[in-house]
Amino acid sequence: MKITLTKPQHLISSSNKRFRVLISGRRFGKTYLAITEMMKYAALPNQKIWYVAPTLKMAKDICWSNLKEILNKFNWIEDINETTLTITIRKTKSTISLKSADLPDTLRGTGLNFLILDEFADIDKRAWFEVLRASVSDTLGNVFMCGTPKGYGNWSYEMYLKGKQDPEWDSFQYTTLAVSYTHLRAHETERN
């Protein structure tokens, strides 16, 4: 079994920056990319990985079934806890957990090796600045923030700009039109 990424997804995945920000239109494949990124870190021993969405319902609806399906295809799953939404990886004992940012204080106290903030523009910025940023500080964990555009007044734009100015950050932006074109070109290439 092989992971296949589009060229834009591969470009993002290949970035060696500690903090990566993706703003893209719908149907880019943000969730699929997030899952492949979690797998990259879960392949290492004893990693603690969190996927955080604005609400637990969103985390489950967006990611949970896809994550389980892909990990199962690779035969990576040792244990699934449906109550805590946590998967333990067979060979490495790493864990992937889905979390909600709607009560940020419940996210305190855990050191993380990798953190995904999905639809992060809809997450209260205090969850990042007051809670989650600290969770990757002592571990020097990596972060991938992704979501759809919410405008210049949203904190997501501030994070996007960091990727253009801070050497530890990288930012990527793709419009829905560019995404549609990329998928169309990939489909045409597969047919030929």
Question: What do the PLM-derived regions correspond to, one by one?
Answer:
Residues 1-185, 191:
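Phosphate/NTP-binding elements of NTP-utilizing enzymes
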